């Protein structure tokens, strides 16, 4: 994110979860010295655990900043139409119901301001009460597009689907180090028919993360434990 560049913030410590992420911060876009950027893990990850698992599918798309000021522009965008169609997909809703799954829609805070524009099926639960971590811990399957919530969810080794039907997402910097197709923790899907088929496959297999993606999780995160806060505390104390 460009807002943490040195001449904007001049931070004393930047935390990363992966050596690859750390390497990306060492580029010229940020201008920090290497000792400032540490791969210690995120303290918030310590609260992630697969407890109180429920049969629920979590839908959490990213936001499009350029649609912020106009309801008309939002409602007529490919981004909105694709999401609205998903939230009204009769095949998905019916299959989830048959399998005993609830579908939870957790809109981005900015998108929540426009929730009245959606034609929401009565079986879709719009969550405005639970924290992100509560939903991550409880849910069995995540559907997002480009959102960083996939990192939190994949830390638990639960399946992620990147539904990237709209290619209008604006990355903060010109090129991200993270390639969704080769590094992502789940399938990258463009078409709604393919998405529904894949979701049904996951529900048929109790939402078990596939081995190829478990391997990617293991390769990406330097640590997969609940000692992130301790590592950060120790580093601050020693420095």
What are these regions (language model features)?
Residues 38-116, 189-191:
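Conserved catalytic-core segment of nucleotide-activated headgroup transferases in glycan assembly
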Residues 32-33, 119, 148-220:
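Catalytic binding pocket for nucleotide-activated donors in carbohydrate/polymer assembly enzymes
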Residues 1-47:
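Active-site and donor-binding regions of nucleotide-sugar-utilizing enzymes
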Residues 4, 92, 132:
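Acidic, amphipathic alpha-helical patches
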Residues 109-151:
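Donor nucleotide-activated moiety binding/catalytic core segment of transferases
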Residues 19-22, 43-45, 62-66, 109-112, ...:
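Short, solvent-exposed loop/turn segments at secondary-structure junctions
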Residues 12-18, 102-104, 142-143:
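A short beta-strand/loop micro-motif in the catalytic core of glycosyltransferases
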Residues 225-239:
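C-terminal alpha-helical cap of glycosyltransferases
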């Amino acid at each position: 994110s460009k807002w943490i560049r040195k001449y904007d913030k001049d931070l004393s410590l930047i935390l990363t979860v992966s050596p690859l992420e750390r390497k990306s911060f060492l580029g010229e876009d940020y201008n920090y010295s290497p000792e400032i950027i540490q791969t210690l893990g995120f303290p918030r990850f310590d609260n992630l655990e697969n407890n109180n698992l429920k049969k629920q599918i979590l839908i959490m798309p990213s936001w499009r900043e350029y649609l912020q000021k106009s309801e008309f522009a939002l409602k007529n965008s490919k981004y909105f139409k694709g999401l609205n169609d998903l939230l009204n997909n009769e095949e998905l809703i019916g299959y989830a119901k048959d399998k005993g799954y609830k579908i939870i829609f957790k809109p981005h805070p900015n998108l929540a301001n426009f929730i009245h524009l959606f034609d929401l099926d009565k079986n879709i639960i719009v969550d405005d009460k639970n924290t992100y971590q509560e939903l991550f811990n409880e849910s069995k399957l995540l559907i997002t597009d480009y959102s960083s919530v996939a990192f939190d969810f994949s830390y638990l080794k639960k399946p992620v689907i990147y539904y990237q039907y709209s290619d209008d997402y604006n990355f903060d910097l010109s090129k991200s180090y993270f390639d969704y197709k080769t590094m992502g923790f789940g399938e990258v899907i463009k078409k709604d028919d393919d998405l529904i088929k894949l979701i049904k496959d996951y529900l048929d297999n109790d939402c078990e993360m596939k081995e190829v993606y478990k391997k990617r999780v293991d390769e990406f995160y330097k640590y997969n434990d609940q000692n992130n806060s301790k590592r950060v505390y120790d580093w601050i104390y020693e420095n």
